[in-house]
Amino acid sequence: KQIPSLKHFSLYSERDTDKYNELIVPLVYRMTNLEELNLHLVVYCEKRFIGGYDLTRNIISRLLQLNKFVFNIRSRLPLNDQAYLSSNEDSQRSFNGFKNNKIISCVDYFPDRKEGQCHIYSYPYPAKYYEYITNNFPDGLFKYVREVSLYDERPFEHEFFIKIAKSFPFMEKLTVYNNKPQMNKFDERSKDDNRHLSAIQYPYLRLLDLFDAHDDYAEQFLLEFKTCLPIKLNLHVHFSTLSRVTHNFTRNATRMNCAKIIDSGVSGGNSSTSKQLLKDYVSDAKIIFSNSVE
């Protein structure tokens, strides 16, 4: 049944769906007089990513009254020995017919997970979250985004975090998913090597989740010459990671940033001695220990 009276429609979903063609596209077809459409989706695809050709065929050509189309679609694709994998250039080229919008696309492939990802969105980006950013992140200013997650099977280097801080100046929550060690490491003893580094500022950051990150990323955020953390930070991290990065809670170069932690969710470190070492090092923080497997 058609819905001709509907002029504006928005659909936001952070959960994956594999029913894009079966449910979402037919739903939009019913809105024959739609003038404004907002789609924010994560779609699991079987054969190909969602791109400009798909949106033109299934959305734009069907909605003749449409004058504003805002979208943020991240599609996922299993890697099954496909003969051809589309590139970011292919994805961007599919939007050549979008005359009234600046469209950004970012295509990535993850061999370990055997999965591909294509993130397409109209810019300026209106959402409050930006998920699974990779090293291919194309820059830009995202002043509405408050929650960010990073994922890649290649390491994130210091320069990448500079880019993230500049692109998301009002970021409040950051989650890092990356088990690959950094290639370009710097030590507080190597002062000559560190001269070109600038301590990255995250003035609005309130929650930093490093549960699924290599130790190097805890070091990236806790070393004072790499990062200047804000006060009242909530840190989620494994006890073993924190112990190694702080040299068993004796390292001076991590002491300043650790002093800014007000809440910390820590997995492991169940002995009374371990707990006391951490509490002495992060003296002002409320620490919640869990028995999660590290």
Question: Language model features by range: what are they?
Answer:
Residues 1-294:
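Eukaryote-biased activation of long, low-complexity terminal tails and linkers
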